[in-house]
A protein has these predicted regions:
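Cytoplasmic membrane-interface "Motif A"-like loop-to-helix N-cap segments
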Residues: 68-78, 266-280
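Conserved MFS/SLC helix-loop-helix module at the cytosolic interface between two early adjacent transmembrane helices
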Residues: 57-93
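Helix-to-loop junctions at the C-terminal end of transmembrane segments
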Residues: 58-70, 257-270
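Cytoplasmic helix-loop-helix junction between adjacent transmembrane helices
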Residues: 101-140
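C-terminal transmembrane helical hairpin of 12-TM major facilitator-type secondary transporters
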Residues: 272-317
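Helix-loop-helix hairpin linking two adjacent transmembrane segments in secondary transporters
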Residues: 135-182
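Extracytoplasmic gate region of multi-pass secondary transporters
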Residues: 27, 207-248, 255
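A late C-terminal transmembrane helix in Major Facilitator Superfamily
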Residues: 325-361
Length: 388
């Protein structure tokens, strides 16, 4: 496969999609875990978060290692972990087994979230790199939607693990396809202590601030994905399966938002003013989206607007990754830092949003959104010149 071509970028993109599905495929199954294993809402929030432990602890250091062993190898390994994890889910018989597998499954994120953007940055030509990274950013909505759809049709049935079987097949296909991935150009060895090189990304202000900005978007976006099915079901008398399917379809609206943002950036639009508009929009849209008593139509329109804005904001932030990386051939460390910070935020997010859902105090939802948006604007590293 030709390095830097759109087909190769598209294949790399699929690893991000399948990995994001790992995060969300469990959400429609909350009732099944309660019925089958007596899992409480707090226990389910913990189960949801366990996936993020490996990237939260290891992603930045693993990214530095991936810069040496090769991002292609990392993606093949991630797909292999996906096959093993989903097979184990099908065989698990206890909550403890699910918890252990959920942690193991997090190693997919360690490999894919560092390896995939690094391989794109290393192989895409400079004139295509920014748009390719904006396209890459849409893996989140597509993957989250895929995960919700994988399980939504099986939720509440005797075959409630059916989504895990489908996910296994998807990762098996990616494992085979991984051997057709392009090989990145060789990376020069850098002098210095090995431990210092592993932690170098944490000492670079550009990647660190960009990663923290992305973490604020995770707090908003993933938080909504956690609470919306139950919130919508309670407000409108819908089932969890129906609410999860609506959210999955709504997440797809993030794709045109991300692509539009990528197009605007490629045409010279500055990223910070664009992010400013998007964060103000997020705070305003959260009101009709989460306020009790709104009509079904208004809430779904607000959901579509929210997802469009979220997709655009993610694209703006992710497209800044090549700008803050000193050498495009060594992007895995910076991508790993972004993954590690976002994983830490992902771990905390259910612990912030789930208690608000349980209390029914919806103004706290809006406060979390507004605070996260303000922090994103403060943290985002501004470009010194207009993007080319």
């Amino acid at each position: 496969m030709k390095p830097g071509s759109w087909p190769s970028i598209g294949l790399i993109y699929l690893y991000g999609v399948a990995t994001s599905a790992s995060l969300s495929k469990i959400i429609p199954l909350q009732g099944d875990f309660a019925a089958q294993m007596g899992v409480t809402p707090a226990g389910f929030s913990l189960l949801l978060s366990l996936l993020t432990i490996p990237p939260a602890l290891l992603a930045a250091a693993a990214g530095s290692i991936i810069d040496r062993i090769g991002s292609r190898t990392a993606l093949i390994a991630a797909a292999a972990v996906g096959v093993i994890a989903n097979l184990a889910y099908l065989l698990a018989e206890s909550l403890a087994a699910f918890q252990f597998i959920r942690v193991f499954e997090g190693f997919i994120m360690v490999g894919a979230y560092s390896g995939a953007p690094a391989l794109i940055m290393a192989t895409a030509p400079p004139e295509r790199r920014g748009r390719a990274m904006a396209f890459w950013s849409t893996y989140t909505p597509v993957g989250i939607s895929l995960g919700l759809l994988l399980s939504a049709g099986f939720a509440g049935t005797a075959q409630w693990r059916g989504g895990y079987a489908i996910h296994l097949v998807l990762f098996a296909a990616l494992l085979v396809a991984g051997f057709t991935l392009p090989r990145p150009p060789p990376v020069p060895l850098v002098a210095g202590a090995p431990r210092a090189r592993l932690l170098a990304a944490w000492t670079q202000p550009g990647p660190l601030r960009l990663s923290l900005t992305f973490g604020m978007l995770v707090m908003m976006g993933f938080g909504l994905n956690i609470v919306f099915p139950a919130w919508y079901a309670a407000q409108h008398g819908a089932s969890m399966g129906e609410a999860s399917s609506l959210l999955a379809l709504g997440n797809l609206v993030m794709i045109p938002g991300g692509l539009l943002a990528g197009t605007l950036l490629a045409r010279g639009r500055r990223d910070y003013p664009l992010l400013l508009v998007l964060m103000i929009a997020a705070a305003l849209i959260s009101l009709p989206l989460l306020m009790p008593g709104e009509s079904r139509v208004l809430r779904l329109l607000a959901l579509a607007a929210w997802q469009f804005e979220s997709g655009a904001a993610i694209a703006v932030v992710v497209a800044g990754l090549p700008r803050v990386v000193a050498d495009a051939r060594q992007g895995a460390a910076a991508a790993g830092l972004l993954s590690q910070v976002s994983a830490l935020i992902t771990f905390v997010t259910p612990l912030v949003w789930a208690p608000i859902l349980a209390s029914g105090q919806w103004p706290w939802f809006v406060l979390v959104v507004a605070t996260s948006a303000a922090l994103a604007l403060l943290l985002f590293p501004r470009a010194t010149s207009a993007p080319g």
